[in-house]
Every structure is written in structure tokens, then in C-alpha cells.
Curated annotation (Swiss-Prot):
This is Ribosome maturation factor RimM. GO terms for cellular component: cytoplasm; ribosome. One of its GO terms (molecular function) is ribosome binding. Residues 96-169 form the PRC barrel domain. The keyword Ligase does not apply. The PRC barrel domain binds ribosomal protein uS19. The lineage of its organism: Bacteria, Pseudomonadati, Pseudomonadota, Alphaproteobacteria, Hyphomicrobiales. Belongs to the RimM family.
């Protein structure tokens, strides 16, 4: 049983494929066929899965795991999410303007005046470009485009995003920006 400290979702298993224990899976990697390149995949209940074979098929990959040898065993995995440890992702392969979704979650979104618009709670791609979900205390979640116009700077070390609230669609009128005041840190007693 493996407990992941910083899990990153890599794939979700769909239905069984054929009679030999293969499964269809939705891979969340840039190259779906590279799903097995990250080592063993893990479920949140502690099981570990070794990829033996993988092939791409339309919008999914077909995967054969060690120990999953028949259709019944494959069907039992339907809906299972598979993760790896964040440390297993290769940082050196990223370009300067590329980020892992997992690294963006938890960053605080602020404008150039220091006004906080919430924390990144999710990153989504519905087909028209990536979106960041921001959630602030007592506020409903909002989605903003993850684009150069909306997100001006990302500082992983400081845990912040510098955003343009007008380009992000958080305000409709530039005059509204002057009404916001920066969040003041609370004094320690």
C-alpha cells in the first residue's frame, strides 16, 4: 500500500477493452502514449499498477496492467483514478512558460495593486483553452482564462499569480478597479 504525499492525477480508467484484462483510460498527460513512462501508477486506496502495454485509440489509451488478466478484473477498475507522486514529473522538460496543473493549485491570484481575487482551486481544459478556478473566502468560485493577457506573471516560489482583473473578466469597467483596496495583512498580537 502506497500513500502519496503530493498526488498528481494522470489517468481515469473507463471500461474494459476485450477479454484479456485491458482497460480504456483517459490519460491527462501531454502525450497520452507516455502514461507508462512515469513509473507505477497508484490509486488513492493504496493499490499500485504497473503498465505492461499501452496503445492509443481515438480519444483514449488502451492499457494492460500487471495482474489484471481478464475482463472481470478490468471491469472492477472502471472509474478508478490513477496518480503519481509530483516528484516523479520531470521539471527539466518544461519550457519557461509551461507549468504542471498541480503546481498552479493553491497559488493566490492578486492584481498589481495587491488586491486578492482568491486562490487557484482547479485548472480545467474544456477544449477552448485552459481555465483557472479561483475561490476566495465567502465568494463563489469563478473561472478565468489561463492566458498571457489574464495571467501576467506566475511566481511559484512566492505562491502567487499576478493577474489583470479586466482581461480576466473579473471586472467589467476599468473604473471599478479604483474601488478595490489591497488586502491588509492582519497584525500579529
Amino acid at each position: 500500500m502506497t500513500k502519496l504525499e503530493n498526488p498528481v492525477l494522470m489517468a481515469t480508467i473507463g471500461g474494459a477493452q476485450g477479454l484479456r484484462g485491458e482497460v480504456r483510460a483517459k490519460a491527462y498527460t501531454a502525450d497520452p502514449g507516455a502514461l507508462g513512462d512515469y513509473g507505477h501508477l497508484h490509486s488513492m486506496d493504496g493499490r499500485s499498477f504497473e503498465v505492461l502495454e499501452i496503445r492509443e485509440m481515438k480519444n483514449v489509451v488502451v492499457v494492460r496492467f500487471r495482474g489484471v488478466n481478464d475482463r472481470n478484473a478490468a471491469e472492477a477498475l472502471n472509474g478508478l483514478e490513477l496518480y503519481i507522486e509530483r516528484d516523479n514529473l520531470p521539471d527539466e522538460e518544461l519550457d519557461e512558460d509551461e507549468f504542471y496543473y498541480a503546481d498552479l493549485e493553491g497559488l493566490e491570484a492578486r492584481d498589481d495593486k495587491g488586491v486578492s481575487y482568491g486562490t487557484v482551486t482547479g485548472v480545467f481544459d474544456f477544449g477552448a483553452g485552459d481555465l483557472l478556478e479561483l475561490k476566495g473566502p465567502g465568494k463563489r468560485p469563478v473561472l478565468i482564462p489561463f492566458s498571457e493577457a489574464s495571467v501576467l506573471e506566475i511566481d511559484l516560489e512566492a505562491g502567487t499569480l499576478l493577474i489583470d482583473p479586466l482581461a480576466a473578466g473579473l471586472v467589467d469597467d476599468p473604473e471599478e478597479l479604483s474601488k478595490f483596496t489591497p488586502d491588509k495583512p492582519k497584525k500579529k498580537k
